[in-house]
């Protein structure tokens, strides 16, 4: 099972119910809605479709609202665009004007206060570079020199690398969009152009004052100021997005890979999800196959430790949206198979942990790797336990069983976590039973698999995880008194007396009988294990089994009736348990 999550941007190329169904089947975990485009009616229709299709498919899909953010853009140009020529001069006006060969204006009227002579201004994703040569504050004009030629059209992005601007953390449009998201029940807010912790707190205050405190805030790090303030930003956030598009314009491109690794590592240490985004499979907007560099980019983000990888134009507007998700899924699966999870968990074990839940998470991950378990089952009310286990990268899926749909969608972004919505349990026994039954029902685990189950007392209270159990998921057939510590697996021979036992080939079989005796010895000597209805450590079966060194289970009531002849079973002498089929027993 793939552990790295896939975030898909939903747009005209993917908004139909048919395409959404295909994206979910291909592996989409979180649907991103880009509020830089479209109106509330369009986004509501998309949200409704995503929820409906996910419900019909029985899948958990989170919804991420990506704000437009406090960006700077150019205003309109005469005839739609200007031709800027290297070496010529052009002014930037703080008052809105129609752009011409002498002057154009931008949407941020305090730009003149933020730049100085020598400052660099980048236009249209950095394709055009201007250098500030002077300012006329009285007239509200910035004088610039055109460093490289290009066509400048309407509403193009403006970046000022290395300059701290006075833009607000949240615009009026952002606030309206976030309130819309609260009403529609989205799960995550991706906050664009976050520069400092106060930007995040401004959004959090809006959420808390409007019954939206359950929404998680994922700041997008897109400028040098955000990079410089990353620790304070992460402290007040629920995760991060490495938004490499604007980031690669705001800082030198050669620094982007280093910043990416640094941000991912900080999120890993904090146990918070991180999304790596922008141009991951960009060529698949037009082509059915990615470039080799793109495949390596996705793989390296996974090696870095990212929780999620994101598709933007590939799924929103591209020709091959489903193929893009399928490709990303294959790259992720192949990459994850090459990761040394023992090394990862050993490195993270050296970090300090300050609470019981995290200690259990660390222990569960380490034990999962040592025992090569099929999954870790983590019943949870808040999702915190599942996050803490995933933080230590157990190398197997973390199945988070919760009674809250909201909690399940929050976990859709967490590495390795597969949420299931189940019934609310009121006791430890119910928790264990519910988590196993739901995991089997969803086919994440099967009979015979070894799993780890975490739980907490008192039941139902967040942050009380204090129990870890190693459990064999088995189709339990019968139970008795085991003698010895061995396990036997094989075909059964059911015989009620010596004559029946000797009539069958017992070589390597498990002999099931009422009670053994001296006449049955030739059959017993060839068998792999012995099960008797007769109980007691002094019974013939117990004594003979010990002398032969084979696993024995005695005192199994109605064994010759319960256990069918010729069936494959597993007997665990240490626990005295008999399972149908081939069960993994520790």
UniProtKB/Swiss-Prot annotation:
Pathway: Carbohydrate degradation; glycolysis; pyruvate from D-glyceraldehyde 3-phosphate: step 5/5
Cofactors, names only: Mg(2+); K(+)
Positions bound to ATP: 34-37, 73, 156
Alphabetical keyword list: ATP-binding, Glycolysis, Kinase, Magnesium, Metal-binding, Nucleotide-binding, Potassium, Pyruvate, Transferase
Positions that bind substrate: 32, 245-246, 278
Residues binding Mg(2+), per UniProt: 222, 246
One Pfam match: PEP-utilizers
E.C. number: 2.7.1.40
Protein name: Pyruvate kinase
Source species: Sporosarcina psychrophila
Gene: pyk
């Amino acid at each position: 099972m793939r552990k790295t999550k896939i975030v898909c941007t939903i747009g005209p190329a993917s908004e139909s119910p048919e395409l959404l169904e295909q994206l979910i089947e291909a592996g989409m975990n979180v649907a991103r809605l880009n509020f830089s485009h479209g109106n509330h009616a369009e986004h509501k229709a998309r949200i409704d479709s995503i929820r409906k299709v996910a419900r019909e498919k029985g899948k958990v899909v989170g919804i991420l609202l990506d704000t437009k953010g406090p960006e700077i853009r150019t205003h309109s140009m005469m005839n739609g665009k200007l031709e800027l020529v290297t070496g010529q001069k052009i002014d930037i006006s703080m008052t809105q004007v129609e752009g011409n060969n002498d002057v154009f204006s931008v949407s941020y009227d305090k730009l003149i206060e933020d730049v100085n002579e020598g400052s660099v201004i980048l236009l249209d994703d950095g394709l055009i570079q201007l250098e500030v040569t002077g300012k006329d504050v009285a007239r509200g004009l910035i004088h610039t020199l055109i460093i490289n030629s290009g066509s400048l059209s309407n509403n193009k992005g403006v970046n000022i690398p290395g300059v701290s601007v006075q833009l607000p953390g949240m615009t009026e449009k952002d606030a309206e969009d976030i309130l819309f998201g609260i009403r529609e029940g989205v799960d995550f807010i991706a906050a664009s152009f976050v520069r400092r912790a106060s930007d995040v707190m401004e959004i959090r205050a809006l959420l808390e004052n409007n019954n939206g405190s359950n929404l998680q805030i994922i700041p997008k790090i897109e400028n040098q100021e955000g990079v410089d303030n990353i620790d304070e930003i992460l402290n007040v956030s629920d995760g991060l997005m490495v938004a490499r598009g604007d980031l690669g314009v705001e800082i030198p491109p050669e620094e982007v890979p280093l910043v990416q690794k640094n941000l991912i590592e900080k999120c890993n240490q904090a146990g918070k999800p991180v999304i790596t985004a922008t141009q991951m499979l960009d060529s698949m907007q037009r082509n059915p196959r990615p470039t080799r560099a793109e495949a390596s980019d996705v793989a390296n983000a996974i090696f870095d430790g990212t929780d999620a990888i994101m598709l933007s134009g590939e799924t929103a507007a591209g020709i091959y949206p489903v193929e893009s998700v399928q490709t990303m899924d294959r790259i992720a699966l192949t990459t994850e198979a090459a990761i040394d999870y023992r090394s990862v968990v050993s490195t993270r074990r050296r970090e300090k942990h300050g609470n019981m839940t995290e200690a259990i998470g660390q222990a569960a991950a380490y034990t999962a790797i040592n025992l090569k378990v099929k999954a870790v089952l983590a019943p949870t009310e808040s999702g915190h336990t599942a996050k803490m286990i995933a933080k230590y990268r157990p190398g197997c899926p973390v199945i988070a069983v919760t009674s809250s749909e909201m909690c399940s969608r929050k976990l859709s972004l967490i590495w390795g976590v597969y949420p299931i919505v189940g019934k609310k349990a009121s006791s430890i026994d119910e928790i264990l039973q519910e988590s196993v039954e739901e995991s089997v029902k969803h086919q994440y685990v099967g009979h015979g698999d070894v799993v780890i189950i975490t739980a907490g007392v008192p039941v139902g209270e967040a942050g009380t995880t204090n129990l870890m159990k190693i459990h064999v998921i088995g189709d339990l057939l019968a139970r008795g008194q085991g003698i010895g510590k061995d396990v036997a697996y094989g075909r059964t021979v059911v015989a009620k007396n010596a004559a029946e036992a000797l009539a069958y080939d017992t070589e390597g079989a498990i002999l099931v009988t009422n009670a053994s005796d001296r006449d049955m010895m030739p059959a017993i000597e060839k068998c792999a294990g012995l099960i008797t209805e007769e109980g007691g450590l002094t019974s013939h079966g117990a004594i003979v089994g010990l002398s032969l060194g084979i696993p024995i289970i005695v005192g199994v009531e109605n064994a010759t009736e319960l256990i069918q002849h010729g069936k494959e079973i597993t007997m665990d002498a240490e626990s005295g348990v008999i399972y149908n089929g081939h069960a993994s027993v520790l």
